[in-house]
Structures are given as structure tokens and as C-alpha cells.
């Protein structure tokens, strides 16, 4: 089945192999350039990893979800797709694990791991300690925080001795207030159900729907 869009969820992805991140990014990039490059104090630390044109989605829109738990290889993927304008990054600024470490062998089976270089996105942004900034920021919203907000919220009708609205209908004041309460309760239930599912994914779907409308104009 042909995909018309994709949500790539990299939230809480701590990373993995460098080669794997390059392979993943290359699945969706159809332009010349690089996926990522490294720079260090010694010349042999300076390495570029080129793109291999071949977008398997043929330009279909991509949303990448990230949060503070997205690190290392997942940041390489997100940074490459963002710089090549191949995806919209949504969520939160990533962890910022952009250092290259080399292992030096010592005597008696010991080893020493040294940080020798940093990773940079195609446009030259350092990932280390900065992370990847999202194009669209999303705040973490928990079910408990939403319910607290509901309890704290108030409207005119919630105030003691509030002025009642005039109504030309035959409904009584009690009926009208009951209907208002039911509408509010149903709305709150919808939002709570959304949070139980996945707020980030829901917002990503909304963006993809908007992109589809724009591109079809």
C-alpha cells in the first residue's frame, strides 16, 4: 500500500549505531548533500557521510516526533531530515548527545573511552548539548494536569449569583444550565480520551491533514 504521509516517532529513542541512523535518513532524502558530518581536533576526526538519493515516499510529507529523551542517532536522523527540508519536527528540543567517542585499548584488558569529535547537521548545527529544536513545539500534557485545569477553570455561569441569559425559548433556566453542563462534560471527555491515546500523535495528524489541504489547492 502506498503511503501518503508518515509519522516517525523518535520520542525516548536513546540512539543506536551511526550507520543505522544514516541508512534511515537516506530512506527519505532525495537531494545531494550530506546526512551528518563530524569535526574534531585531529584531522582524521573530520568525516562527512553523504546522502544516497532515493526517497521511498516520493516526497510524501513526514512528521518526526521528538522529546527530551531523543538522543544521539535519533538526533542525527531528525537533524538531517530537517535540514534537507524533508520533514517537520514536532515535540520538544532533543537531548543533545552529539559527541563522537573512541575507545583506546590499554594493558591488562582495560580501555579508555575518549571524546574525539562532535556531530554536526548538514547545515552546520552542532548537536552536542544543544539538541535539535522542533519546528512546532508541543508541551507535555498529562491526564492529571488536564483534569486539574478543568477543575480550576471557570465561566460566567460558574460564578455565584451570576446574571442569567435571557432566552426566547420555552426551556427553563434549569434545562438550559443542564444542557450547558452536558456540552462541557462531553468536551472534557473528548480531550481526556485524546490524552489517553496520544496527544503528540493527534497533533501530528492535524498538521498532516492541513498539509494535504494546502498541497491539493
Predicted regions and their residues:
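C-terminal "post-core" interaction segments
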Residues: 1-217
Amino acid at each position: 500500500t502506498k503511503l501518503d504521509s508518515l509519522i516517525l516517532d523518535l520520542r525516548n529513542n536513546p540512539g543506536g549505531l551511526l550507520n543505522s541512523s544514516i541508512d534511515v535518513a537516506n530512506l527519505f532524502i532525495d537531494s545531494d548533500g550530506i546526512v551528518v558530518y563530524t569535526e574534531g581536533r585531529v584531522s582524521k576526526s573530520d568525516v562527512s557521510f553523504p546522502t544516497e538519493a532515493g526517497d521511498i515516499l516520493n516526497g510524501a510529507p513526514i512528521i518526526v516526533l521528538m522529546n527530551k529523551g531523543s538522543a544521539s542517532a535519533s538526533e542525527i536522523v531528525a537533524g538531517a531530515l530537517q535540514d534537507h527540508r524533508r520533514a517537520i519536527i514536532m515535540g520538544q528540543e532533543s537531548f543533545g548527545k552529539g559527541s563522537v567517542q573512541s575507545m583506546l585499548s590499554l594493558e591488562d584488558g582495560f580501555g579508555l573511552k575518549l571524546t574525539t569529535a562532535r556531530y554536526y547537521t548538514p547545515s552546520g548545527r552542532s548537536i552536542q548539548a544543544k539538541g535539535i529544536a522542533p519546528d512546532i513545539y508541543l508541551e507535555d500534557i498529562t491526564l492529571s494536569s488536564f483534569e486539574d485545569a478543568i477543575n480550576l477553570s471557570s465561566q460566567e455561569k460558574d460564578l455565584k449569583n451570576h446574571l442569567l441569559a435571557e432566552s426566547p425559548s420555552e426551556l427553563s433556566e434549569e434545562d438550559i444550565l443542564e444542557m450547558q453542563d452536558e456540552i462541557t462534560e462531553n468536551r472534557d471527555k473528548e480531550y481526556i480520551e485524546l490524552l489517553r491515546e496520544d496527544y503528540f500523535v493527534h497533533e501530528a495528524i492535524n498538521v498532516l491533514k492541513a498539509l494535504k489541504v494546502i498541497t491539493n489547492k
